[in-house]
């Protein structure tokens, strides 16, 4: 596969033409009476027309046929995609999943859409408030099929296998340790080259933003220029048997047929686009004197709520870095949080739990459910000689953190058969070290 080209910058106002049709963008206006190359002009709005300029999202697409050229939508099998957060009763326990099993291609072909499984979520799609966490497990490419989401944005985190994503804006390659965001309403199709697995964070009614940096300053964390946007690419391809367009609308799946590929956008301009990001480019901030900084310093992207400083969802990573804090228990501290914390592992191991939490699996610590390092981690870190050391080399754990109380689906609790019933046992060996007659702690030797 030839190396793909991209435009650099987060949320930028961009313009792109397929080089096969130079001059395909209209000059000085959006909607001429006749577009260059006799294309159709179509606007894709990601915000209300009257949103303030700094939050106004839209792009103009110049395409061979407009998106409206299709047969009626009809309801299709929902598979394991759901927005019913009352399928099973609530469970406040610490939950951990073993690696989710990928279907074997020799047994059944499963593409990206057929392999979507909703794990947990909260909120209401119709009121544009909430989120869902999905797992994708697939082994084949989408053939003459595309998908778009009327409900929200997809933040896609591949864990195993490379993806080639066709969008109306162009093509993106995606591999583990990269993420991409396909925003609401954007049509895309996914090619895979092996058995493939990953995670999806879906947010309703809002878009992902870079977090405010505050006293960090003008630079740091995920820098805007490291986000990549695809360049225009089109195919003028008729599909005699009909091309299938799948839509998720109000949590349900629908499909329609059309005669042509939807990836017929010759040129586009605007600031409402898909984009990708390599997690290795994250500039890590950390404590360099003492104590363990809060994990918010590792936020890559945030989807803000209406309450200042409170997110519907944050995407947080735990990347390789130096640990140098003196007189400090360096692993993550024991915690009870008003937020919900879903964690996944792309590769390696997580610093607070060396065993049991595996790549391709996950964990959920719900609001106010206690969690923290396992017994083995506590004992080792409490006695370790504190020298500068590398932390998390060769690993990448991440967290979807939310102010919403997440409900787990029936698939997540029962059907997937990946729930680790013995998770709680990793804390059972914790013992009291209390010395009521001696205030001085035992110093590591």
UniProtKB/Swiss-Prot annotation:
Binding residues annotated for Fe cation, in chain numbering: 335, 341, 371
Keywords, comma-separated and alphabetical: Acetylation, Dioxygenase, Iron, Metal-binding, Oxidoreductase, Phenylalanine catabolism, Tyrosine catabolism
Gene this chain is encoded by: Hgd
Organismal lineage: Eukaryota, Metazoa, Chordata, Craniata, Vertebrata
Organism: Mus musculus (Mouse)
Pathway in which this enzyme or protein is active: Amino-acid degradation; L-phenylalanine degradation; acetoacetate and fumarate from L-phenylalanine: step 4/6
Disease: Defects in Hgd are the cause of alkaptonuria (aku). Aku is an autosomal recessive error of metabolism which is characterized by an increase in the level of homogentisic acid.
The protein's name in its UniProt record: Homogentisate 1,2-dioxygenase
Cofactor(s) demanded: Fe cation
Xref: InterPro entries: HgmA_C, HgmA_N, Homogentis_dOase, RmlC-like_jellyroll, RmlC_Cupin_sf
């Amino acid at each position: 596969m030839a190396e793909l080209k991209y435009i650099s910058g987060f949320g930028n106002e961009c313009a792109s033409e397929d080089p096969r049709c130079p001059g395909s963008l209209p000059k000085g206006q959006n909607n001429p009476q006749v577009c260059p190359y006799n294309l159709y002009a179509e606007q894709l709005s990601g915000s209300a027309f009257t949103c303030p300029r700094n939050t106004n999202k839209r792009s103009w697409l110049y395409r061979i046929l407009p998106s409206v050229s299709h047969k009626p939508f009809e309801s299709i099998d929902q598979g394991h995609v759901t927005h019913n957060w009352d399928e099973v009763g609530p469970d406040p326990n610490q939950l951990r999943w073993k690696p989710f099993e990928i279907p074997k291609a020799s047994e059944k072909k499963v593409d990206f859409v057929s392999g979507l499984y909703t794990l947990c979520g909260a909120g209401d799609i119709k009121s544009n408030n909430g989120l869902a966490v999905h797992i994708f497990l697939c082994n084949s490419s989408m053939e003459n099929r595309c998908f778009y989401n009327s409900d929200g944005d997809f933040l896609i985190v591949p864990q195993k296998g490379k993806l080639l994503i066709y969008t109306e804006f162009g093509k993106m390659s995606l591999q583990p340790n990269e993420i991409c965001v396909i925003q609401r309403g954007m049509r895309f199709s996914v090619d895979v080259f092996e058995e493939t697995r990953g995670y999806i964070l879906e947010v309703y009614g809002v878009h992902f933003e870079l977090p405010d940096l505050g006293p960090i300053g003008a630079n740091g964390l995920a820098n805007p220029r490291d986000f990549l946007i695809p360049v225009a690419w089109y195919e003028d391809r008729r599909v005699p048997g009909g091309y299938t367009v799948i839509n998720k609308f109000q949590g349900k799946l629908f499909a329609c047929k059309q005669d042509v590929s939807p990836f017929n956008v010759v040129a586009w301009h605007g600031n409402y686009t898909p984009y990708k990001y390599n997690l290795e480019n994250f500039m890590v901030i950390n404590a360099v004197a003492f104590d363990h900084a809060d994990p918010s310093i590792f936020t890559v992207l945030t989807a803000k709520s209406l309450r200042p400083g409170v997110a519907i969802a944050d995407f947080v990573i735990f990347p390789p870095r130096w640990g140098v804090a003196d007189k400090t228990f360096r692993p993550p501290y024991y915690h009870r949080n008003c937020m919900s914390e879903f964690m996944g592992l792309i590769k390696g191991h997580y610093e607070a739990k060396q065993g049991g939490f595996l790549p391709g699996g996950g964990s959920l610590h719900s609001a106010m459910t206690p969690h923290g390092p396992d017994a083995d981690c506590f004992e080792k870190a409490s006695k370790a000689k504190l020298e500068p050391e590398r932390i998390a080399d060769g690993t990448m754990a991440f967290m979807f953190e939310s102010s919403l109380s997440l409900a787990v689906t029936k698939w997540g609790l029962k059907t997937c058969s990946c729930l680790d019933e013995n998770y709680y046992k990793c804390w059972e060996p914790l013992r009291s070290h209390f010395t009521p007659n001696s205030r001085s702690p035992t110093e590591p030797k």
